[in-house]
């Protein structure tokens, strides 16, 4: 059966996460239903990352096996026609080999977290940023973030129910960009690693926000990391500011699209 890789964007607000649910709406369920309108099913798609409820994506990657050969451009268009009016779009499709797996072939994943420091409520970005009503110290957050880059035991920064075999991960990148917005500042955290633990990004950003607010000293983040204790973590921030922005592979399946 021919295999196709799909690059997908979605607004996570109306979904109970990526993974198919028995009753609640999911991104996986929406795309599998769209595939079922193209070919008889059942269809199962596998994704590079199973994003949680409310988490968005601009560069999710999934793969599916279909019963006939499709022109990738036409496949993306047909899926988008059947996904309307849901906030999900297949932005690219590509034919790949049967050894390609969206999750297990990936060599890096990239996330963006948008944190807005502004007293006034967000309007145009409601549901797409995490807003806090107090100012933040960007320099202090950068100083604290530097302690987390590299290979570490991230037990402190993973969910209690995380099913990963090991808490040891290599965080290749954690950068912070500041953007002036009307009457506030948006802080954009960019994180890159081969893989992440459950709630790792939201735990890190929630902790760094405490540093920015002055509730934590930057060195306390290093102490929390070395404690290897979930109780040492700061608060887990809400999901709406988090975006899966890209997935890397040894060879880009979408290079020719």
From Swiss-Prot:
InterPro entries: PsdUridine_synth_cat_dom_sf, PsdUridine_synth_TruA, PsdUridine_synth_TruA_a/b_dom, PsdUridine_synth_TruA_C, TruA/RsuA/RluB/E/F_N. One of its GO terms (biological process) is tRNA pseudouridine synthesis. Substrate binds at residue 111. It catalyses: uridine(38/39/40) in tRNA = pseudouridine(38/39/40) in tRNA. Keywords: Isomerase, tRNA processing. It comes from the Bacteria. Coiled coil: none annotated. GO terms for molecular function: RNA binding; tRNA pseudouridine(38-40) synthase activity. Its EC number is 5.4.99.12. Belongs to the tRNA pseudouridine synthase TruA family. PANTHER family: PSEUDOURIDYLATE SYNTHASE, TRNA PSEUDOURIDINE SYNTHASE-LIKE 1. Formation of pseudouridine at positions 38, 39 and 40 in the anticodon stem and loop of transfer RNAs. This is tRNA pseudouridine synthase A. It comes from Cereibacter sphaeroides (strain ATCC 17025 / ATH 2.4.3). The lineage of its organism: Bacteria, Pseudomonadati, Pseudomonadota, Alphaproteobacteria, Rhodobacterales.
């Amino acid at each position: 059966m021919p295999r196709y890789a799909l690059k997908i964007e979605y607004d996570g607000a109306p979904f109970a996460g990526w993974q198919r649910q028995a009753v609640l709406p999911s991104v996986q369920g929406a795309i599998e239903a769209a595939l079922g309108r193209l070919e008889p099913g059942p269809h199962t798609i596998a994704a590079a990352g199973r994003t949680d409820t409310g988490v968005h994506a601009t560069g999710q990657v999934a793969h599916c096996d279909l019963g006939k050969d499709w022109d990738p451009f036409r496949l993306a268009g047909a899926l988008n026609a059947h996904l309307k009016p849901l906030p999900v779009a297949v932005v690219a499709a590509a034919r790949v080999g049967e050894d390609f797996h969206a999750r297990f072939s990936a060599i890096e994943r990239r996330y963006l977290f948008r944190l807005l420091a502004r007293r006034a409520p967000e309007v145009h970005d409601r549901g797409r940023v995490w807003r806090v009503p107090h100012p933040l110290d960007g320099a202090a957050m950068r100083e604290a973030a530097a302690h987390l880059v590299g290979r570490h035991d991230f037990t402190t920064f993973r969910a209690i129910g995380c099913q990963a075999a090991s808490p040891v991960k290599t965080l290749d990148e954690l950068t912070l960009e500041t953007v002036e917005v009307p009457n506030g500042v948006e802080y954009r955290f960019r994180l890159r690693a081969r893989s992440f633990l459950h709630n790792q990004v939201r735990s890190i950003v929630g902790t760094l926000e405490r540093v920015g607010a002055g509730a934590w000293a930057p060195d306390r983040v290093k102490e929390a990391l070395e404690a290897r204790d979930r109780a040492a973590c700061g608060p887990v921030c809400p999901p709406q500011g988090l975006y899966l922005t890209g997935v890397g592979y040894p060879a880009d399946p979408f290079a020719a699209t």
